[in-house]
């Protein structure tokens, strides 16, 4: 991400009126290796391949704000690996996570964690430290530190199925696990900030498992922990939340948790989301990422993009797909989104000019 792109993103996050709606995409290892024709293992384990891949993407699409920017990740492995989850790697896919907390009460026997030294968190920090100055020398910045959320992490450590059952059958044990995951996440974000330095001005939290629970369980098992994470960082930092599962139960509470930007899934029309939280959050979405973004024609992408933009009312929005960029999304469909946005921004300027003419 370029400094001027981050400035635009911050202004959008604060619901400032912008002359043009910006476009941002969440890109990481589910999409980048396949798009560039490289092996996932090379992307993860060869520092030069990782650096050149990210540089190529940013140069190929200079007008798109890539979030979180130079994201060093091993799929979803870093956070659960700190707490002992088993990680399997594949040549042509992201890693798989397997739970190792077979009984919830065994959490009392967990060894103390240390994010700077533990598993894939330590490897991630090393890569950031290795390439930080090189990234800056190319004119880019690293404005965001990133983590999976507390329920997502807990689900990998205990298994999502077991966690869902135990929210009902053993709420006390679940609170203990989610509290531990929250502490890991806060320390993990702070460790990234320490390595990356003073270009960091925001956090990016991804937690789809929040979308698996009802409103009552959200209030008890998710909201207090998400708020703790947001409260652990400066008030003027931008806080982004991603959940491309169902957001109905949590949507109205996310601004109170401390989030400024919401990236949500294809399930809920932007008009409803705008009506419910559009005066309190910037909406980053929500072109259907799979059926349209990957499988659609450029014309279908154009139509879907214009529908999202019209539904947004042209304010308080950052154009994106509904979630992360899906594996297999082709260049022509990304360009179709850009072209539709340019078309919308041009017509918007004409309409605004006519009102003031």
Regions found by a protein language model. Give the residues of each.
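Active-site loop segments of alpha/beta catalytic cores
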Residues: 1-43, 50-53, 67, 88, ...
């Amino acid at each position: 991400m370029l400094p001027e792109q981050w400035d635009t993103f911050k202004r959008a996050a604060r619901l400032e009126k912008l002359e043009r709606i910006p476009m941002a995409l969440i890109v990481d290892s589910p999409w980048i290796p396949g798009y560039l024709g490289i092996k996932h293992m090379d992307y993860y384990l060869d520092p030069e391949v990782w650096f050149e891949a990210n540089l190529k993407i940013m140069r190929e699409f200079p007008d798109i704000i890539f979030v979180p920017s130079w994201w060093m990740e091993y799929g979803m492995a870093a956070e659960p690996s700190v707490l002992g989850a088993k990680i399997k790697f594949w040549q042509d896919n992201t890693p798989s996570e397997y739970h190792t907390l077979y009984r919830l009460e065994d959490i009392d026997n967990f060894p103390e964690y240390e994010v700077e030294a533990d598993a894939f968190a330590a490897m991630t920090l090393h890569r950031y430290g290795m390439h930080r100055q090189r990234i800056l020398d190319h004119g880019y910045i690293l404005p965001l530190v990133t983590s999976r959320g507390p329920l997502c992490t807990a689900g990998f450590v205990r298994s999502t199925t077991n966690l869902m059952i135990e929210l009902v059958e053993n709420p006390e044990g679940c609170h203990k696990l989610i509290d531990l995951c929250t502490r890991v996440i806060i320390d993990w974000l702070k460790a990234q900030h320490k390595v990356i330095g003073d270009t960091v001005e925001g956090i990016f939290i991804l937690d789809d498992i929040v979308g698996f629970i009802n409103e009552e369980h959200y209030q008890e098992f998710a909201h207090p922990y998400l708020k703790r994470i947001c409260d652990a960082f400066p008030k003027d930092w931008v806080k982004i939340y991603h959940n491309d599962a169902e957001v109905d139960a949590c949507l109205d509470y996310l601004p109170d948790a401390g989030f400024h930007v919401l990236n949500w899934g294809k399930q809920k029309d932007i008009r409803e989301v705008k009506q419910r939280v559009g005066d309190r959050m910037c909406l980053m979405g929500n072109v259907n990422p799979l059926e349209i973004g990957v499988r659609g024609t450029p014309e279908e992408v154009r139509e879907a993009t214009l529908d999202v933009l019209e539904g947004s009312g042209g304010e308080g929005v950052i154009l994106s797909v509904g979630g992360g960029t899906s594996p297999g999304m082709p260049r022509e469909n990304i360009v179709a989104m850009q072209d539709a946005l340019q078309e919308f921004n041009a017509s918007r300027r004409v309409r605004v000019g006519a009102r003031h003419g």
